[in-house]
């Protein structure tokens, strides 16, 4: 019975739970890799004594965190659990395809870990640029395994996004028009289209790389009339939308959390928030070359990409100010999800500001491939996406499990994590401005102080992670009843009769009634 329930599941709640559990495990693997990186960099001199191994760990850390932690949790976990509940649907549109979409992820993960375990590992960075990833500089099957891993993860995402798009278009309860769709549903909807348009480009690029490596094509080899810069264009045409794929569901979640704990019926500027997400999605495809300012583009091209990148700050700023407007003057409950959300509003904005700095192609010439870039994207991912996952998890945990997390210890966890990530990544801005390059396992003595502080912060973050595992155990062990929200919320997911909602949510089709005041 249990085998058929979890292995052959066609239930959106069970599949969402599988995604959340898988993402948690993958997150621990990715965190372990980041600890190896920070241990190597804690002091000058070598710990691993092998740059190739160091680069393999860096590559695997990035790919694990992106494809096996953030995406499965945000889109697979929260998306599967919440979207049917929020739109009043009995399940997803294609339940069996949903199951397949999940079960492609563990084999993909195994392939990625295998790529690190055979030959010399794939020490290419997550960008897999040729000629470093060619069969001359990376002989053996490591890069091929990594490519197959990405193919599988991409196939999984494609199946998932077909499901989400179909569900959101066709399975809304009567009365729920698109302009009444909860913001989290909108965010996953936009994210699904970003995946739909960007993943095939990645698939094409890595397939071309695969043939270059194995059957003597020369797409990226100048000796045969190819161009390695073509790979960079293809990769970043996927890679830039990808970073918005990672953060957009988080935007949706924190809009819900802020609305909920401000005691409001709906978010401030609902329509503006929706259009801002769509604008971010569209603009995300028009700025890819800002990752390649140093490849020798002419000045007009660089001017365009600088300007277009800065324009993305407008809809993003609109979201930040809408969140602040919602908080302003409301009777806040200082609950755990709200703390995470306020952390995001502050720290994501900080990361966005360093992004504006890097958008200037002339400044990026100096800062490209330094730790300033590392600091920038870890502020928006480690303190945007990851904090959003914690905000969403702590907010909806009573809905998922029927139990509530320990309120005080949850806040303790937040403060440990807050100190840890800031201590890890803030000093990296200084290292970058001082010229320390990325992806090196050793550095001159002048950089010792900030690297040591950064590594201490990393240790604190690990303590926070272990404390979080204890929090989850504690919640299930003590079985405190989940606290039902005191006031009805505009979002449907809290309206069901039990926590968690029954295995099959409905006995009959629900309908939404709009009360005009």
UniProtKB/Swiss-Prot annotation:
Heme a3 binds at residue 376. It is a multi-pass membrane protein. The keyword Nucleotidyltransferase does not apply. GO terms for cellular component: mitochondrial inner membrane; respiratory chain complex IV. There is a cross-link at residues 240-244 (1'-histidyl-3'-tyrosine (His-Tyr)). The keyword Transport applies. It comes from Strongylocentrotus purpuratus (Purple sea urchin). The chain crosses the membrane at residues 17-37, 63-83, 102-122, 145-165, 183-203, 234-254, 268-288, 305-325, 338-358, 380-400, 414-434, 456-476. Belongs to the heme-copper respiratory oxidase family. Component of the cytochrome c oxidase (complex IV, CIV), a multisubunit enzyme composed of a catalytic core of 3 subunits and several supernumerary subunits. The complex exists as a monomer or a dimer and forms supercomplexes (SCs) in the inner mitochondrial membrane with ubiquinol-cytochrome c oxidoreductase (cytochrome b-c1 complex, complex III, CIII). Ca(2+) binds at residues 40, 45. Mg(2+) binds at residues 368-369. This is Cytochrome c oxidase subunit 1. SUPFAM superfamilies: Cytochrome c oxidase subunit I-like. GO terms for biological process: aerobic respiration; oxidative phosphorylation; respiratory electron transport chain.
